[in-house]
Amino acid sequence: KCNFRPQFSKPVLPNISSEKEGSADEILKKNSLDGLKEKFLKVFKIEEKYLKTNDQYLKYKDRLDHELKIIIEMKYPSYFLIVSDYIKWAKNNDIPVGPGRGSGAGSLVAWCLSITDVDPIKFNLIFERFLNPDRVSMPDFDIDFCEEKRDLVFKYLTTKYKDSVAHII
């Protein structure tokens, strides 16, 4: 008679921290804030010197801080950084990437990191549908790559993250 009960634990993600850039939490905060500033400069055409007094920017910054707090508390900064990394790599290597769909499109952090191309505040999307402290499962971005070139993305991931990569077909 077998009496095996599997033990489930939190996913183990590669360590994204570095001496130069700091912890994954610090890198996520910096990259997200840099991304938000870039969106306001390019999308909203607001000069950087006016950001700290712009009501719209302050609204976005409050939402960003709220999301970052939850992501960090739930220990998912590395996940967001890894997804951002391979999506930016794909875009820089002429691999078409979908704009973002599913509940992940509700994340302002994802938009700031270029994971999605959807401004969740503009479309009244709710972050907590994607990630909240009551959720037991790991968040999951629905990402679409060009079918002809998606193997290149997997090759990039396995080259960079080695044994930390798994792929379900």
State what each model feature region is.
Residues 1-169:
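Phosphodiester-processing cores and adjacent nucleic acid-binding clamps
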